């Protein structure tokens, strides 16, 4: 279970990213007004610099790594104890699971809070209604405008 603990979260992040490393592609999906909308794009290349610094996250010994992505410097903490080369959002490619990643200004900060085995339905990529990235963003922004203009006191984008 990852949480975005950035210094400027606008609202709760509730998206799923499907990564296909063989094709260097990803599908971003998000449920907007009860529709699972998504778009495809190329996975960004991550050129990681491994750093000898260590710290514990939960009960895992983690190592530090840095990369530049989207015009920002990102710092990641990964563990070899879980040998999966994945992480939150678009981040991957380290020799273990990324448990924490943030930019140097803390505008983006994903942190592992727990590893929970759950019995729940998994949304599969073929359940996503594909559109263009621009159209998904436009649909999301229209929903946000609609919510901010209404008298709704609860954030409907947040799960209870």
Language-model features: where?
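Extended soluble regions of mature proteins
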Residues: 1-160
């Amino acid at each position: 279970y990852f949480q975005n603990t950035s210094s400027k979260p606008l609202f709760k992040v509730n998206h799923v990213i499907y990564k296909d490393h063989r094709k260097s592609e990803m599908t971003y999906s998000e449920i907007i007004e009860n529709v699972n909308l998504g778009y495809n794009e190329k996975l960004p290349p991550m050129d990681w610099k491994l750093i000898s610094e260590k710290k514990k996250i939960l009960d895992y010994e983690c190592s530090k790594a840095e990369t530049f992505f989207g015009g920002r410097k990102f710092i990641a903490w990964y563990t070899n104890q879980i040998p999966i080369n994945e992480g939150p959002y678009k981040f991957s490619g380290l020799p273990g699971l990324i448990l924490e990643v943030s930019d140097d200004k803390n505008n983006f900060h994903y942190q592992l809070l727990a590893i929970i085995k759950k019995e729940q339905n998994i949304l599969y990529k073929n359940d996503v209604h594909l559109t263009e990235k621009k159209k998904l963003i436009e649909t999301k922004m229209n929903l946000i405008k609609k919510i901010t203009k209404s008298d709704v006191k609860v954030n409907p984008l947040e799960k209870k």
